[in-house]
Amino acid sequence: MFKEIHVLGRSQIDELRQIAASAPFVDGRITNPHNKAKQNLQLHDAQAYQKSSNLLLQALMAHEDFRNFAMPVNIAPALLTRYTPGMRYGAHTDNAFIMLQPQGSLRSDLSCTIFLNDPASYEGGALTIQLGTSRMSFKLDAGYAIVYPSDMLHEVEPVTSGERLVGITFIQSRIKDSFQREMLY
């Protein structure tokens, strides 16, 4: 089950874009160097990371639809990621456990992508999720989030022009099993 939620207003989007424009990004494989499928850039500045993560997580938690759907116990810090032409993230499932600093871990039941660019500003770059024999594609308006089970096979299609800027995070839900969560929602 997927949930699309409008979580960011124009001023929040503008602030996140400004953070991204003024902070350094590095090869996304810095957090997973053995992942050959990952070809993107991620924010690499502690102060900008903290500010953008707080803004994104506060926006998510402010929405009753998100809280009712995800039933979060814990949410990983949100990370800004950028895709420029030629970049993609091949088919994968997200890690079952996310290590949190300085200690601990989070069971990743749900993944969340928050779109920060309008879809017309870049070509390609859709988030595609495998659902049995079907594929669902998401390229949402800026300010919208898509929440989906972390164990579903998904990918970011290659960006062919423009720039795809998103925030990503992972959620540990009160209800681990996606089928049980769907029945409750």
Please give the residue ranges for each predicted region:
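Non-heme Fe(II)/2-oxoglutarate
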Residues: 1-79, 178-185
